[in-house]
């Protein structure tokens, strides 16, 4: 590659641009710029030529037209090794531009503001920036294009090692990054405007554009005959499996990631020290405790058999004693916590294959978001299920005691994360038995009781949560038969009166939430 002789720099995000420009000037690079960037560089003592001087044409239309000029785009797009291009550039007095450093008006940050108007949004749609970026990316054999300030150091290192040029390989990588960036930028504009084509603001835009970045490849997908990879959402920041840091252990598998997501999102529901153990995307043991050691011990004892090879999530810092209890007691695939002490890391290091993850802490009230589910030829989109209940209405003659209500709310939170049809038995802020994924709700109840019996835990005196209404009274009859004293469910069945009557017959207290939590 030839040495960089001229760079056009015009950025909204100005992190590091002064230092970068000063370094370019040190290589004798002529710097062209516009507006606020030119002002900033001049104030820093860096020689700058205005683009309007370079083109011989003034900025106009309140700055909407600055760089949309043949001398700019001809200087970027002209192929240096094409004699016809070179001749035309010389004929029209077009000088080459060897580097384009541009980032875009902050459209997404602007529309994220509560008081953003349509005019604000429109004025933050960049036109000249994407045009220059795409021109430079297209001609990446001859032009270096930088859209991310994180790449300034990479470019300067290459220029230092080469005497002022950037390799074709780096130029190509930077060009690909440009197209990824402009695709996401246009997608954000399309999504925002597409929700405003009618009266008011639609819940969902006319078209939906999403961008995910490859986070890791995998040996295989859900099964060994399937290939797999993990992509993360652009701009994802909330504590999650997508943002978590792996401290040690084998590479996360496709199933590890899905199961860890289920465990972490479930444990986020609780403010008290909590432990969630997940197997095949279903909680098999969940408990609260005075500390996470107690919570883990209770959760494990719910279903020791299913906990083997499970995923364990905490909502508090993982300490040495809890880490030791886990690795000495059971085989575990993944442990994830918001923070991990150094001593806990050292304990887990004795089991080199265990994947230890640190995800950071999360806000008590998560921001609204969408859930996506791929179907053949399409995608289902919905609001994430972040709410717990619409109301708490006692519908039976007997109201639950304070202790029963505490356990009902605990099991209700767990039931949100159990595959439907979901039944959860619980007592003393711990699951007693979990029945998941059955086509018949009463069968889920039977399985929950079998699980409890298998673990040697009596159901007598426990409460029950159901993720959806009972269509018949048999669910309540079954609950009474195993000793359940209180039930929480959404209600809404045609036979609610029959189900309530069954509860009253058995002396069971029952609460309706008016909110269903199907999970498929």
UniProtKB/Swiss-Prot annotation:
Chemical reaction(s) catalysed: (6R)-10-formyltetrahydrofolate + 5-amino-1-(5-phospho-beta-D-ribosyl)imidazole-4-carboxamide = 5-formamido-1-(5-phospho-D-ribosyl)imidazole-4-carboxamide + (6S)-5,6,7,8-tetrahydrofolate; IMP + H2O = 5-formamido-1-(5-phospho-D-ribosyl)imidazole-4-carboxamide
Pfam families hit by this protein: AICARFT_IMPCHas, MGS
Record keywords, A-Z: Hydrolase, Multifunctional enzyme, Purine biosynthesis, Transferase
One GO term describing the cellular component: cytosol
SMART domains: AICARFT_IMPCHas, MGS
Source domain of life: Bacteria
EC code(s) of this entry: 2.1.2.3, 3.5.4.10
GO molecular function: IMP cyclohydrolase activity; phosphoribosylaminoimidazolecarboxamide formyltransferase activity
GO biological process: 'de novo' IMP biosynthetic process
Segments forming domain MGS-like: 1-147
Record remark: domains: The IMP cyclohydrolase activity resides in the N-terminal region.
UniProt similarity note: Belongs to the PurH family.
The protein's name in its UniProt record: Bifunctional purine biosynthesis protein PurH
Organism: Geobacter sp. (strain M21)
């Amino acid at each position: 590659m030839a040495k960089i002789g001229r760079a056009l720099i015009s950025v909204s995000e100005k992190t590091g641009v002064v230092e970068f420009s000063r370094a370019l000037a040190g290589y004798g690079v002529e710097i062209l710029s516009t507006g606020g960037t030119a002002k900033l560089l001049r104030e820093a003592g860096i020689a700058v030529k205005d683009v309007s001087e370079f083109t011989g044409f003034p900025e106009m239309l309140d700055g909407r037209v600055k760089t949309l000029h043949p001398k700019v785009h001809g200087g970027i797009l002209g192929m240096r090794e094409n004699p016809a291009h070179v001749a035309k550039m010389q004929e029209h007095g077009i000088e080459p531009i060897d580097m384009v450093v541009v980032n875009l008006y902050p459209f997404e940050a602007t529309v994220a503001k509560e008081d953003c108007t349509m005019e604000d949004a429109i004025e933050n749609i960049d036109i000249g920036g994407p045009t220059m970026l795409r021109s430079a990316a297209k001609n990446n054999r001859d032009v270096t294009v930088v859209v991310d300030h994180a790449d300034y150091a990479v470019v300067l290192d290459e220029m230092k090692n080469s005497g002022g040029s950037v390799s074709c390989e780096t130029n190509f990588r930077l060009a690909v990054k440009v197209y990824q960036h402009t695709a996401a930028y246009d997608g954000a504009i399309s999504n925002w405007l597409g929700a405003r084509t009618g009266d008011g603001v639609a819940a969902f835009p006319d078209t939906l554009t999403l961008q995910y970045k490859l986070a890791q490849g995998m040996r295989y997908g859900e099964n060994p005959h399937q290939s797999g990879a993990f992509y993360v959402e652009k701009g994802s920041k909330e504590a999650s499996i997508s943002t978590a840091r792996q401290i040690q252990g084998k590479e996360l598998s496709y199933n590890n990631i899905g199961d860890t997501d289920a465990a972490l999102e479930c444990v986020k529901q609780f403010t008290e020290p909590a432990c969630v153990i997940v197997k095949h995307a279903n909680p098999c043991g969940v408990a609260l405790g005075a500390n996470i050691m107690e919570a883990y011990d209770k959760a494990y004892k719910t279903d020791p058999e299913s906990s083997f090879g499970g995923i364990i999530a905490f909502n508090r810092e993982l300490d040495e004693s809890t880490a030791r209890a886990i690795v000495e007691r059971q085989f575990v695939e993944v442990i994830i916590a918001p923070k991990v002490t150094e001593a806990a890391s050292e304990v887990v290091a004795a089991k080199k294959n265990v994947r230890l993850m640190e995800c950071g802490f999360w806000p008590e009230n998560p921001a609204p978001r969408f859930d996506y589910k791929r179907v053949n030829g399409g995608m289902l989109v919905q609001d994430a299920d972040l709410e717990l209940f619409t109301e708490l209405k006692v519908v039976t003659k007997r109201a639950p005691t304070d202790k029963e209500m505490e356990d009902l709310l605990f099991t209700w939170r767990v039931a949100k994360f159990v595959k439907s049809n979901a039944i959860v038995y619980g007592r003393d802020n711990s699951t007693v038995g979990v029945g998941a994924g059955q086509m018949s709700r009463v069968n889920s109840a039977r399985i929950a009781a079998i699980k409890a019996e298998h673990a040697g835990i009596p159901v007598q005196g426990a409460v029950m949560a159901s993720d959806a209404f009972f269509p018949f009274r048999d669910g309540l009859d079954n609950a009474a038969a195993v000793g359940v004293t209180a039930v929480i469910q959404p209600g809404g069945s045609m036979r609610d009166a029959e189900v309530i009557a069954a509860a009253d017959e058995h002396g069971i207290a029952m609460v309706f939430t008016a909110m269903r939590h199907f999970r498929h």
